Amino acid sequence: MTQTAIEIADNSALLVIDVQKGFDAAAYWGPRDNPDAETNIAALMDAWRESGRPIVLVRHASVQPGSVLAPEHPGHAFKDLVRERRHEDDLLVTKTVNSSFYGTPDLAAWLTDRGIGQLVLTGIQTNMCVETTARMAGNLGYDVLVPLDATHTFDLADGTGPGGLSLTAAQLATATAVNLQGGGFARIVTTAEVLAAVGERVTA
């Protein structure tokens, strides 16, 4: 999706945002897009681990009544692909809002302490916590890459709003790509592009 080759910094941080079991509840969320998202996230985690780059795991602790992402709900747990790859050196950020920068511990402080200036964002939902985190990261001056095929989202409607508006998950993902790259917040890339760039540095 990019026009020029990308470079992945030696200390580029991979953010794995809200890849939690609660998002498997189709009856709760509705139709989703991109069934390959989890496979691509796993591939990126493996590449980051092999190359010794830092990984940040972000987990949403919903405060909404009845949420499948609430801490007391089984859906709060990470999906198996994350749980099986989790390492003690990974940073775990817990948040209650969309942005990963408003969580505990302080993500920006952790990145600054390690001199990290590039972030690769993956996870769920594309147009919610991934996009919000990307926008804020861009505002904070980070070089942000979003492999869109390592994210997914769900159909969305405006509920009881007067407009009766709705978009499919695929439409929302496209809107996120346009918002982020067109708005100058992040570069939209593919998992294959990122893996190729990581591989070049590993074998160099």
Language model features by range: what are they?
Residues 28-57:
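A short alpha/beta connector and helix-capping loop motif
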Residues 17, 53-60, 147:
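Short beta-strand segments at enzyme active-site cores
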Residues 23-27, 64-66, 155:
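A short acidic, helix-capping loop that chelates divalent metal ions and anchors anionic groups
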Residues 2-13, 43-46, 50, 68-204:
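Active-site-adjacent betaalpha module
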Residues 41, 59-62, 97:
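Short glycine-rich, polar/acidic loop-and-turn segments at beta strand-coil junctions
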Residues 24-34, 161, 165-167:
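Acidic/histidine-rich helix-loop elements
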Residues 1-26, 38, 58:
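Hydrophobic, well-ordered secondary-structure scaffolds
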